[in-house]
């Protein structure tokens, strides 16, 4: 059997769609059906065809995932908006019970992420993700019905379970459609939804909290509206999100073949490889994997501090309950814009480490500035510091997730590593939930200092990983007598990872 692709040419490459010429000029085995191993001469693919394919993915997949993550972030953090409307007082919270309520979410969030991640490989991310969305939408609705601290604790526990594997699932799902060099900006668009959710949540809360005279409190209406819309969107996503490139009804047969070849060439040797639990755990043997996990934890503190406490940080400047939510909109939107900027720069430079350091430094400076000035006498500077805080917090999370996915081409290992790394970042919400103590309100100076310190630790870890990768790549070049980059590594060598002497790190 011989399979040809009409969209093959020797067109010139641009910076967005550079293909690995040395890889595409080789004899590439492609599995076009059961029992049929075909070897075909594949040259540089038509870059216009690839751009059209990516554009289809961008318009048919990314908006759905962004919508999913928007409500994922919204339903997780809407309690911070509800608190500004007196939720904690209405439910009879005393002492540090609000902090405990924030903390309880992260325990099942971390415990369930790893086992739940296997559902994606077993049943497909396109089916499991909407199920989780239905679940956390239902929990958001339940928050409107709780009457006391115990009830809210129970709901937040199940909300943590429902949201635990959403982010790893989305990252894994995107790696089955996009090349490594295309991933950061797409993940950035997806992650930007979390920033947009903060802005959207602030605007919605601003409007809802103006409702007077109803049978429910404003914060209860907020939970009902957000939970109800989440539930409806989950049904739409289940019906529309493609299971894989092979089943995407918006692709032609030629585009499906092209899409499969792209990922086979850029990722592990087979897209549909079976999940091996024992093999997947070998990803943690390399010291770099441990450093990445520590990096995720360090950078998780600034990210969760922003997600959980931005309304309270803004409220410290003296704004009213209603206006506080409105004033969180601009920093959140700015964070989404900077997230895209950092991601596009990273993809353009083909470098994660340098851009990561720039993003983390920006956020760290924001926390330091806010904590070191008299905020009531310098409202403008304090508010500007909020923009700095949000500028790099989400970007650092995006680039870190992309970084280790870029360097973990084996599909099973990638799924497992993501399901561990992302929850570790989120479990640091336990830290952010407990360093913002009631006795330190309204400015929370100790919490701001601790958050900045974790940012500094993150910078040290990123720098250490980058330096190791640079010199390890040089060592491999010297041993083989040839200079290579990650783009020069053939497909068959990618799955083995660093154990293969031909492997090169994506810096």
From Swiss-Prot:
Main location: endoplasmic reticulum
Record has Chloroplast as a keyword: no
Low complexity bias: start-end ranges: 1-12
Protein's GO biological process: carboxylic acid transmembrane transport
Keywords assigned: Endoplasmic reticulum, Membrane, Transmembrane, Transmembrane helix, Transport
Region (Disordered) location: 1-20
Membrane-topology descriptor: Multi-pass membrane protein
InterPro entries: MFS, MFS_dom, MFS_trans_sf
GO CC term (a single one): endoplasmic reticulum
Localization terms from the record: Endoplasmic reticulum; Membrane
Listed transmembrane segments: 57-74, 100-120, 126-146, 157-177, 189-209, 221-241, 283-303, 326-346, 353-373, 379-399, 416-436, 445-465
Pfam family, one: MFS_1
GO MF: carboxylic acid transmembrane transporter activity; transmembrane transporter activity
Protein family (similarity comment): Belongs to the major facilitator superfamily. Allantoate permease family.
The protein's name in its UniProt record: Uncharacterized transporter C1039.04
Lineage start: Eukaryota, Fungi, Dikarya, Ascomycota, Taphrinomycotina
